[in-house]
């Protein structure tokens, strides 16, 4: 059976994004799939919108996470994690402190990697997939009409997530 995960569609207006990041405890883990967008711009913008301390890790590289982490951990590019790093992150997310939130950014769709056994299925299901509907890296240029149209298309489509 092919694993599927429905996308959560988010309007990336600053006010909407702040409300989404300030969700009820425990705060959700997020995966932002951003094809055709500069990943650094997305990471920079997400970090500027997060409340509280922000810890950033560029991957691949050493993945060391403090046990007492609070605030937001931003990881990029999560598709490049080694199998050992995936297992470490999965275990950390499972018992993470309630005040910590993990936001991962990638340009590679993870579902094909899960299907090929290159990405840990358990970690994939612990990350909520968020499709990039607006141009987060381009500031306030997103329009409500475009976002509404994208949301309607997403909800009318299949349950598999898509990169945009």
Where are these regions (language model features)?
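Charged helix-capping and loop-helix junction motifs
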Residues: 115-119
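ABC-type ATPase nucleotide-binding domain
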Residues: 126, 130
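AAA+ ATPase active-site-proximal loops
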Residues: 2-113, 134-164
């Amino acid at each position: 059976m092919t694993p599927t995960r429905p996308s959560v569609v988010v309007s990336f207006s600053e006010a909407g994004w702040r409300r989404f990041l300030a969700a009820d405890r425990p705060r959700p883990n997020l995966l932002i799939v951003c094809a055709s967008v500069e990943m650094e711009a997305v990471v920079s913008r997400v970090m500027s919108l997060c409340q509280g301390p922000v810890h950033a890790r560029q991957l691949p590289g050493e993945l060391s996470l403090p046990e007492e982490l609070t605030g937001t951990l931003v990881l990029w590019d999560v598709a490049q994690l080694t199998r050992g790093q995936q297992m470490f992150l999965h275990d950390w997310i499972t018992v993470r402190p309630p005040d910590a939130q993990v936001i991962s950014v990638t340009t590679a769709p993870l579902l094909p990697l899960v299907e090929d056994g290159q990405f840990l299925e358990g970690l994939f299901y612990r990350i909520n997939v968020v499709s990039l509907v607006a141009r987060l890296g381009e500031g306030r240029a997103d329009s409500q009409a475009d976002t509404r149209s994208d949301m309607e298309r997403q909800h009318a489509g299949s349950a598999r997530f898509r990169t945009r």
